[in-house]
Every structure is written in C-alpha cells, then in structure tokens.
C-alpha cells in the first residue's frame, strides 16, 4: 500500500529530525514572504506595509510547538500558494492556469494534513465569489480531484485497492 504525503512527511521528520527542522524553517520563510507579498500586492492594508510577515512568524512559532511541525508548515505553504493563485485568477479574462493550480493545492491539503479537509469548502466559495465560467469550474474540479485520484491510481498500481487510500 502507498502512504499519503502527510504520512511520508511524518516518517521523514521522524527519520531525519535535523533536516526536517531545516525544511520546516525554509517553508516558514517561504510562506511568510508569500503572505507578505500578497498583502502588499493586493493592498490589503491602507499603506504599503509588510506587517503580515512578522504576524505570520508569530503564528508559525505556535505551529512549531507541535510534534508534526513539518506537515503543519507544508500545509500552510500549500494554503498560501492556493490563496495566491485564487487571487491571480480574479481577472477579466480566463484564469484556467491559476484556478487549476489553486484547486490543485487545495486538493493536496487534506492529503498532507487531514485537519485541513474542511478547507475543501473554499473551492465552491471561491468559484462563486470570482464568478468563473463553467469551463473554469470544470478545470477547478479537475484540479481538486487530481491529487486524490493520482494517489488512488498509484496505490492501485502498487497492488492495493483503488479506493483504499480514500477509505482510510
């Protein structure tokens, strides 16, 4: 049977704790800079400030206290990437690439951190909020289902049941 990405990250953290801390630190820096860039680019504050970077750092210190810090930082990086791509898809023309990537990251979230499964509700809300066409909705649903279907296919190719990773 094939392990989920969250299980693989937990195994990596257990086997290589020093490398896991380094990777978690890099993920924390990447996510903090991404969140800071989002706030400046889309003018979420009245003046051009990078206040979101230290705010994310303070929140990330709380994430690092738990035992599965690598999966928590990977999930927060995926959420930041999904938010960035949802913001990019808000345009006058078609945003197939951005909405596909955003839904792909949202689809990966429950595989990395199962506590993020309720965030799957974000996709229909984002599609309705951004008033996307039916073609873009189809692309978004395909991006959402692609990680789960890929994991099921790889598990089936390894000799397990096709729906075994979803049933767990």
Where in the sequence are the language-model features?
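TM-lumen/periplasm interface segments of multi-pass membrane proteins
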Residues: 1-29, 33, 38-41
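Transmembrane catalytic cores of multi-pass membrane glycosyltransferases
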Residues: 1-4, 136-168
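Aromatic- and kink-enriched transmembrane "portal" helix at the membrane-lumen/periplasm boundary
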Residues: 17, 53-73, 85
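Hydrophobic core segments of transmembrane alpha-helices in multi-pass, intramembrane catalytic enzymes
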Residues: 28, 71-83, 101, 119-123, ...
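Transmembrane-helix signature of polytopic, membrane-embedded enzymes
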Residues: 35, 39-60, 76-77
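Membrane-interface transmembrane helices that cradle and orient dolichyl/undecaprenyl
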Residues: 81-97
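Membrane-interface alpha helices of multi-pass inner-membrane proteins
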Residues: 98-112
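Perimembrane helix-loop-helix junctions
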Residues: 119-144
């Amino acid at each position: 049977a094939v392990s989920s990405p969250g299980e693989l990250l937990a195994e990596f953290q257990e086997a290589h704790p020093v490398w896991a801390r380094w990777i978690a630190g890099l993920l924390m820096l990447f996510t903090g800079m991404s969140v800071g860039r989002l706030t400046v680019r889309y003018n979420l504050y009245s003046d051009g400030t990078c206040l979101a970077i230290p705010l994310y750092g303070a929140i990330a210190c709380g994430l690092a206290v738990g035992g599965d810090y690598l999966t928590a930082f990977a999930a927060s990086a995926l959420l930041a990437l999904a938010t960035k791509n949802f913001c990019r898809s808000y345009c006058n023309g078609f945003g197939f690439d951005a909405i596909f990537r955003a839904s792909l990251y949202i689809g990966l979230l429950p595989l990395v951190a199962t506590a993020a499964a309720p965030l799957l509700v974000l996709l229909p809300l984002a599609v309705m909020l951004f008033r996307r066409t039916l073609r873009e909705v189809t692309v978004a649903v395909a991006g959402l289902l692609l990680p789960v279907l890929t994991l099921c296919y790889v598990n089936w190719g390894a000799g397990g049941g096709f729906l075994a990773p979803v049933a767990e």
